[in-house]
Amino acid sequence: MRASTVSLKQTKLIRPPRDTVPGQDRPPNIHYVYTLTSFVCLGSFLFGWNQGVMSMIIADKRWLDLMKPANDWAVGFVVSIYNIGCAAGAMTIGFFADSLGRERTLSLASIIFIAGALLQAASYTITQMTVGRLVLGVGVGAYSAAVPLYITEIAPAAIRGRIGAINLMILCFAEMVVFFFVYGFFFMNSNDWWRLPIAIQIVPALILAVGCWTWVPPSPRWLVAQERYDCAHEVLCRLHGSDVAELEIKEIRESLVVEDVSAQSTWADMFKGPVLWVTFLGTTIQFLQQITGTNAIFYYAPTLFMKGGLTAEAANLATAGVGVVLFLAAWIPVMYFDRLGRKTWLQIGTVGMFFALIGIAMLLRHAERHPGDAANNAIVLFPYLFYTFFNMSWSSGSWTYAAEIFPISLRAKGNALCTASLWVSNFIVAQTTPPIASAIGWGLYILLAMFCVIAFFFVRYALIETRGRTLEEMSQIFGLEDIGGKQADGNSERNELLRSSIDSARDEDNE
């Protein structure tokens, strides 16, 4: 058998809830799944807060006068260096999530996050701010990889898309709140108004650190990988019910057969044989999520609106409206994402994003030729349209897809690599948007629309639909039976019982 990785947790049974008796049959507890998901998604809340907090700050003259950036490239670097930190943080997940566990990795990420927030809030120079952004980015990057990984591994297959959409909804709720929070502080008669929106993040980060270390249970799939089968059985009973707990453990154990016999998986395994194709799909879908324009609009929304003719105050208010649209649109995948499937939603979203980007380009072109025309104010509508389609598709779809397609022995490393791909493309977008916008103006959004065309054909012809499949069946779908185990080897009775249980859980949840 494979040697267990050292665990920081005791190996005794996890204490069951007060209203249960060990060994007693228990029904699926979907509400417990939702509770755990909502709590660990505090990491996504902090992710969303940081996506929105800087867009208004970097457009404020008082902040610019204090920090004195040399040019547009310097402003872009303050924004984009955060993404380098995020990429580094995401890459650490492959090691820490496998050794410490998913939930304790979130605690470690929170400590790093708090250090970065303190550095930023205390900054008086552009260099200090940049270092703080880098450190905080490491924590956010770890959140961005570990949260989807954990919630994917605790969710029944029938609602896994919905669980991923809840992650998105909480992220978007944070973006909405931070926009109005920063907008309110924008009117303070102080050059240091921006410090509080940054410093206040420490509170939820501290709550997440303590909760993940003391209350959140380990992922059952991680427990099986550590050969802690009794603990895994207890967690699965609490999450999915007694009827399928033993069967799911068997599936997970079978998915680790080859890893038990052979050496521990390495980063090189991500680029060998059929796994290379899965790695390509996961990293490309995350890369395209960013390169199609979401943060080219989001990070510089106030600047975009002012170019369209809005005043600084109106531009900030319109930017706050982006947060409202993001939050409202995030409810669509929560309710319907598992009904149509990943590919369908991604294609619908890409088409809508394409036309929204064309609309932005045309109105910016009109604003350049006809400054002061009241029609220029319509530029507000197209970013709203863009984010409606983006949030109902790519915002949750790319994260869900990338987190679920890898075999269990490579899942943590695969998720880390895919998340790092997203942050690298995010860095490219954040760093190049200001100078490209200065050079070609509205042409930037035509360029982004062309990336949407590429994304559409990639989704249509390269992706394989994964809706309704258990994580242990993914190896069969992608032809990785000899890598992830023989979990989908034709035992139809077991798979049918699993599907029956999770379908009944979904029916119960919908009532």
Predicted features along the sequence, with ranges:
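Alpha-helical transmembrane bundle of multi-pass membrane proteins
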Residues: 1-240, 257-511
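Short intracellular "coupling" helices and adjacent cytoplasmic loop segments at the cytosolic face
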Residues: 238-248
